[in-house]
A protein has these predicted regions:
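C-terminal transmembrane helical hairpin of 12-TM major facilitator-type secondary transporters
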Residues: 318-364
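Cytoplasmic membrane-interface "Motif A"-like loop-to-helix N-cap segments
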Residues: 89-100, 313-324
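Extracellular/periplasmic helix-loop-helix junction of adjacent transmembrane segments
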Residues: 44-76
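Extracytoplasmic gate region of multi-pass secondary transporters
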Residues: 41, 250-299, 394-398
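Multi-pass alpha-helical transporter architecture, strongest
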Residues: 211-218, 368, 420-439
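C-terminal ends and interior cores of transmembrane alpha-helices
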Residues: 101-119, 326-341
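A membrane-interface helix-boundary motif in multi-pass transporters
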Residues: 185-202, 403-421
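Glycine-rich segments within core transmembrane alpha-helices of 12-TM secondary carriers
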Residues: 160-184, 385-397
């Protein structure tokens, strides 16, 4: 696009040291934010219906718990607008330090929150408030972290260097699932419900301090600094960054929403909804999907950078479409495996969805989305599109899936169709969208 400012092949790339510091800083913050955000989803599936909604029955309590999970996504676009605006004006690094602080404090407070039996309806009210703060913080995280790594990355290696943001997702999933699984194995059911689930939330403080130390060494990208020099000239004053992005590239927001469906549905159905469905509807042990979450998180630390390297070599679009089609073909077999209660096939199709399909589409998102917008409003544009997609396609995925099962008499077919259709739409969107030179 003619309005997009990017490093051209003939220009000198950012130093390798600068690129690596940006990649590590983006990775560290992403670990904290995704650890906190995913920990909530895991705990909502296991605990929150009984701790915060015991008065409305198991089925409705599950729906209420998953609804609070979705609340975080509702506030992500607002966080993206606020952090994106100031990130485009004041710099990415300042905003990224703030998102980590905010997420860590909110998560630790959830770990200290009294239950419904202790303070009544104030418990779920405060839970929703803290979840909203989490959503607001993570809303500001992705765009800034992705931009800092993409803008600092050497030309031709942007997918690989920016993949740390998504690897942070995998490490966050690994840590959150692993710690919940460890505490679950060391405590009785009553102890886990009483205090055990709180330990992983309080552990977030340690991760926050580590991430802040790493991020403090990051520098702004040369591309952003160059753009700021242009924008400081009187003749270059512009509208608010988010308004600029909306006016210049309205179609880009719809593209991002459609492209993220595969990623969001595959991950949240496998890691959040299936955990609840398999334990409450099928009687499978909760350790099964907690261990699957561990495996998914661990493998993604390898698969995401590998797929990103392949995308830089063979084209982003090819990798993305392949992943989305794998997700399309794995939806119904995954639920058939659940019904059969075969551990081998459950594991196989869970990995096909949450590792292969999911990781192939997320590994190219940072450069694919950010290059839809100009550098002066990229934080706002790519970030708002990303977070609106989170609301539309991801935030209420466990809630929608649970509602489909509840109102269809316990049948899984509608959820499998929901998953399959979303992945197929993502594949078709990638196939038909305007081709980028590196795709």
């Amino acid at each position: 696009m003619d309005s997009t400012i990017s490093v051209q092949p003939g220009e000198a790339p950012d130093s390798l040291h600068r690129a690596r510091r940006a990649a590590w800083g983006s990775f560290a913050g992403a670990v904290v934010d995704w650890y906190d955000f995913l920990l909530y989803g895991i705990t909502a599936a296991l605990v929150f219906n009984r701790e915060f909604f015991p008065q409305i029955g198991p089925a409705m309590g599950t729906l209420a718990a998953f609804a609070t999970f979705g609340v975080g996504f509702l506030f992500r676009p607002l966080g993206r607008i606020i952090f994106g605006h100031f990130g485009d004006r004041l710099g990415r690094k300042r905003m990224l330090m703030m998102t980590v602080w905010m997420m860590g404090i909110a998560t630790a407070c959830i770990g200290l929150l009294p239950s419904f039996n202790q303070i009544g309806w104030w418990a779920p009210v405060l839970l929703v408030f803290l979840r909203a703060v989490q959503g607001f913080a993570v809303g500001g995280e992705w765009g800034g972290a992705a931009l800092l790594s993409v803008e600092n990355a050497p030309q031709g290696k942007k997918a690989f260097y920016s993949s740390g943001v998504q690897v942070g997702y995998g490490v966050g999933l690994l840590l959150s699932t692993g710690l919940v699984s460890l505490i679950s194995s060391l405590t009785s059911d009553q102890q886990f419900l009483s205090w055990g689930w709180r330990v992983p939330f309080l552990f977030s403080v340690v991760l926050v301090l580590i991430a802040l130390w790493i991020r403090n060494g990051m520098a702004e990208s040369q591309e952003f600094e160059a753009q700021q020099s242009q924008d400081n000239a009187p003749q270059m004053k512009k509208r608010l960054p988010v308004v600029e992005a909306l006016l210049r590239h309205p179609g880009a927001f719809l593209l991002i929403i459609a492209l993220r469906l595969c990623e969001l549905l595959t991950m949240y159905i496998v890691t959040a909804f299936a955990l609840n469905y398999s334990t409450q509807n099928l009687g499978l042990p909760r350790e099964l999907f907690l261990n699957i979450g561990l495996l998914v998180g661990g493998l993604s630390c390898l698969t995401i950078p590998c797929f990103a390297w392949l995308a830089d070599r063979f084209g982003r679009r090819r990798i993305y479409i392949t992943g989305a089609l794998i997700g399309t073909l794995s939806g119904f077999p995954f639920f058939m495996a659940l019904e059969s209660q075969s551990v081998f096939w459950i594991l196989f199709f869970a990995l096909m969805l949450a590792n292969i399909a999911h990781d192939m589409v997320v590994c190219v998102q940072q450069p694919m989305f950010t290059e839809l917008f100009g550098a002066s409003y990229r934080y706002s544009g790519a970030g708002v599109g990303y977070q609106v997609a989170s609301v539309v396609g991801g935030g209420f995925t466990p809630f929608i899936a649970a509602a489909l099962v509840t109102f269809s008499g316990g049948s899984w077919h509608s959820v499998a169709l929901y998953l399959t259709a979303g992945c197929l739409l993502s594949a078709l969107t990638a196939l038909l969208m305007k081709k980028h030179p590196v795709d």
